[in-house]
Amino acid sequence: MRHYETLFVLKPTLTDEESKAKFEFIKEVIQNNGGEIVATEDLGVRKLAYPIQKFERGHYYIIYFTAPSHTVLELERIYRITEDVIRFLTIKYETKKDISAWEKMVERAKKLSGQTNSEAKEEANENV
């Protein structure tokens, strides 16, 4: 399994419930296609560097996960057809140096969200 990080930006016009529902939907897509979510980060609503689709702000989310390569293809297909996603980026970590950096980012994300590794796995299992 390969190591990935995906960041996506949702429209700021969505309510908190709608944003959380889209976030959960994206997590389900990853899990249903053979991926395992390691950590997540909700960065909240932030100002965009430049207007996208006439929006100046967006709700940012990051998901760190391991998955086979076909999962990313399906995930990006879903991003493209979901109207509420205004921008996305998926990064694959390949070298040992990249993977160790990925692991450090995962630990930082877990500390910020207050999750331990076992809590993240329990949450992932509950959502399946």
Curated annotation (Swiss-Prot):
GO terms for cellular component: cytosolic small ribosomal subunit. This is Small ribosomal subunit protein bS6. It holds the Pfam family Ribosomal_S6. It comes from Nitratiruptor sp. (strain SB155-2). One of its GO terms (molecular function) is structural constituent of ribosome. Binds together with bS18 to 16S ribosomal RNA. InterPro entries: Ribosomal_bS6, Ribosomal_bS6_sf, Ribosomal_S6_plastid/chlpt, Transl_elong_EF1B/ribsomal_bS6. Disulfide bonds: none annotated. Belongs to the bacterial ribosomal protein bS6 family. Keywords: Ribonucleoprotein, Ribosomal protein, RNA-binding, rRNA-binding. One of its GO terms (biological process) is translation.
